[in-house]
């Protein structure tokens, strides 16, 4: 298969210059995950994993000691400097949001008894038969509904957990809480996922996840073939009178794992928002450097603007739809996104 040799970073006010980076093969991605796992195993998972098995069993919903140590039953992990004590092998897991949390719970092969539900998410088809739809919403979790499933573990993404804590909506008094870390930047999801699976004594699960992701990348690469050889793609979005270009994000990392040249412009991003760069509808020249655009919100009014319609890839009909449920997540979502990108670039034929 023809190889795309580099991922280029372009800037709208200067001539593009290529910075060559070798294509990541399936073996490269596999080696990257292996290095992560081995490193995490040697060093432990932040400060908390060094203490795995060293503390007695304390229920997260009780401040009293059981009086006996049961280290085989519990595991300690650290997320954002907070330590959480969790059951090593939970029996009744409730998932509070249907994106990163559900992705992780499915990857970890947890016995899910109930989950928040998003009918538009590709993850729903992977939910085990018999799992119930959790009452309440992401914004307003329903404690009564959660309790009705008698959970021994709650799973929630870090962003939502922070929101619940800020609003005083949910605590650890119902059951122990696994706060899913999706990475400090969108492109660090692999390291965060591998770290948590390893910390939870699920290294073998992490290895299976790696193999599945590599296999999906290989299938997607084969389908893309030489369609994008020597070409670039942009991962973008439209809203609020602007078009934005993704830089250091989940979707960009998956495209790069596919070996694609991805147009980015971190140099012109706001200092506090380096993951994407935003442009007014009058300054869209950078997008002419892309041969294909994967666009979030393609039905937005901004996508109907005359300046956007003059972008080269738009004129050529080389625009795909970045679905909301594929824009962020962990390995299951990454696999679905890789397959979706391979399908959508077929318009280049």
Language-model features: locations:
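N-terminal secretory signal peptides
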Residues: 1-40, 51-57
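N-terminal export leaders
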Residues: 41-47
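Bacterial lipoprotein signal-peptidase II cleavage site
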Residues: 61-70
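Basic- and aromatic-lined ligand-binding clefts that recognize polyanionic substrates
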Residues: 92-108, 205-265
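A short, structured surface patch at a secondary-structure boundary
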Residues: 92-94, 98-145, 153, 158
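Proline-aspartate-enriched helix->loop->beta-strand connector
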Residues: 150-156, 289-290
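Extracytoplasmic substrate-binding proteins
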Residues: 169-239, 334-349
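Structured C-terminal subdomain patch of bacterial secreted/periplasmic proteins
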Residues: 287-349
